[in-house]
Swiss-Prot record:
Glycans are attached at residue 471. GO terms for cellular component: cell periphery; membrane; plasma membrane; vacuole. The gene is ATR1. Putative component of the machinery responsible for pumping aminotriazole (and possibly other toxic compounds) out of the cell. Probable ATP-dependent export permease. Appears to confer resistance only to aminotriazole. Disulfide bonds: none annotated. This is Aminotriazole resistance protein.
Amino acid sequence: MGNQSLVVLTESKGEYENETELPVKKSSRDNNIGESLTATAFTQSEDEMVDSNQKWQNPNYFKYAWQEYLFIFTCMISQLLNQAGTTQTLSIMNILSDSFGSEGNSKSWLMASFPLVSGSFILISGRLGDIYGLKKMLLVGYVLVIIWSLICGITKYSGSDTFFIISRAFQGLGIAFVLPNVLGIIGNIYVGGTFRKNIVISFVGAMAPIGATLGCLFAGLIGTEDPKQWPWAFYAYSIAAFINFVLSIYAIPSTIPTNIHHFSMDWIGSVLGVIGLILLNFVWNQAPISGWNQAYIIVILIISVIFLVVFIIYEIRFAKTPLLPRAVIKDRHMIQIMLALFFGWGSFGIFTFYYFQFQLNIRQYTALWAGGTYFMFLIWGIIAALLVGFTIKNVSPSVFLFFSMVAFNVGSIMASVTPVHETYFRTQLGTMIILSFGMDLSFPASSIIFSDNLPMEYQGMAGSLVNTVVNYSMSLCLGMGATVETQVNSDGKHLLKGYRGAQYLGIGLASLACMISGLYMVESFIKGRRARAAAEYDCTVA
């Protein structure tokens, strides 16, 4: 059984002819990460994982327990800032629109610009971290976040919503360099498959609902107290980022191995991918404002598709060091996981925006009360994330992934039928609790899958994969939701009808996520059963 387990682990990590050189592909079986990760969960012991990863583990990363705790704290705050940055405009979107004199249809850009850029650049930032140093890229990201968060507040005095939206985009660019490199550092420091690593990733995942809650709540508090002081929501965000920047300098080890396989950056693929992603996202978020009948919208859409098709072909056939390892690109199970995350979090992005539209414009809540209704995310999100950390050794990640998509679907359905005059403590309270499990089962489970089953030299990229899908899908699908809204709201005369229409699209996306993740879960169980049977047979023969 020990030999069988070691073989499975070698397959899941990527088998190399020489560990000091670039990985050499031996066979299609060696590169089928999706199959090996399932078998690993059933046949591999923790001790074997430690031994096989010893080359990558430095026992002197932390001399004292408090150093490790401080490191974990800085990682958690990084995730908090990511989600807070996404939601901090939601509770004050009407205040921002009034301040800049924005048109109603352009409100989606107040939220979408941040995840658009962060989602488009995260994959590149993770690869840059793998090549030039995870900690270096993390600190670069914080510098960008600090500067552009301050500029977001200063844009008030320009009176230009375009300037604000661009500043939000650069704020998202900074976050793109923070979170994937944080997860990459965790992947390098902690041994894959161990309880310690799982619980740390779960702690980081638990910060998503906390960040989402604090972002909209704090901004709502400032906006309700004095709408003219809304820039302080961004000044405070910048201060928090600066504090964590300083802590990260001292808390994050500087001895993490950097690019020992001498990879180079795939600049051609990076340019093709980023341009394609940004243009596609721009089209979907701008079309509801300008109209799909505009020639430039159609032209940009065609150009974006061409860039993305060329990017995929280049990465598969021509790139010497592709942004995505070919084992991931060609592995059906990895694609399944990413598609499930895309549709699930896309539906959540639609819910998030139209939830606040519903609260502010239909129920006429104040910015503070609208932000305060997110409080259930804080409580139940922590519970959900810790549930993953404490049970992941006994429950397949595919199970958590499936039920997280079910939570996204059920939450979207409940949001689409919430009565206007019903108290918050009925349907909406239940919706928030259920959606908490959508967020905080999917993020830790998928992060653990990718981190444990990719080689250590790809840990920055492993963190990038999950965050790219999460952030980009929230922005892109929001544009799709806005398109549906504008088509059914009778030129803004029936707001509720438009909001419901967007939520129905979210239900459709979440349903697709359920089907894809359900198929992956069933296949995982079948392969796990086969792996156990093979292991038992080996023991019997021995």
